Amino acid sequence: MNTNTSTSAHPSAASGERSSLVRLYLSRGILAVVWAVAFAGARDALDGAAITLLVVYPLIDAVSSLIDYRALPEGSERRVTLFNGVLSTLAAIGVGLAGASGVEAVLHVFGAWAVISGAAQVLVGLRRRGPELGKQWPMLIAGGLSLLVGVFYNVQALGDDPSLSALVTYAAGGGVFFIAQAALLAWRTRQVRTQTA
């Protein structure tokens, strides 16, 4: 499914959109990996540093969604991106409040956010599929995994020994998928430039 008819009709617009997404995805991916490294050292105690990092992660997603939203033309993809930005902002607030209640509450909020934002990411990935922006496999896989991992977090929160350690793998994995998508889009941009030169 490809709803990017406006960009395919105007190659320069499509190239600009690809370049914008390359920068956004690369930045988002690097920030996620850096966050994972930082949280790996702070996750043992749910103290002020850990809660701050937990709030920052969905805020990174919220800012990324806002940047993406502002770069998109009107349409349903833009609405989904705005929804994800608002959702991530609410998740940051929710995680901050849940931090006072303990690991279980944090996992529930993080899990609910991961499920809904993962579904939104899959939807945006499906809408971006096409000749201009590629198949979007890294984004589709990352969104699907986010959805499944979110369910796992909620199940884990109900268990005997809930832990925040899985968030490190989640963030690092998500970051790698964003970096992979940026690399694929950069390759596609180079390929298109070579064909039109």
Mark where each language-model region is.
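Structural signature of hydrophobic alpha-helical transmembrane segments
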Residues: 45-60, 102-116, 168-175
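C-terminal transmembrane-bundle signature of multipass membrane proteins
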Residues: 173-196
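Polytopic alpha-helical membrane-helix bundles and their juxtamembrane interface segments
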Residues: 14, 41, 155-163, 170, ...
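C-terminal ends of transmembrane helices
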Residues: 62-75, 121-130, 182-187
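Membrane-proximal helix-loop-helix units in multi-pass membrane proteins
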Residues: 90-139
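N-terminal topogenic module of multi-pass integral membrane proteins
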Residues: 1-73, 190-197
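Hydrophobic alpha-helical transmembrane segments in multi-pass integral membrane proteins
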Residues: 35-37, 91-101, 145-163
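Cytoplasmic-side transmembrane-helix entry/capping segments in multi-pass membrane proteins
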Residues: 75-87, 134-141
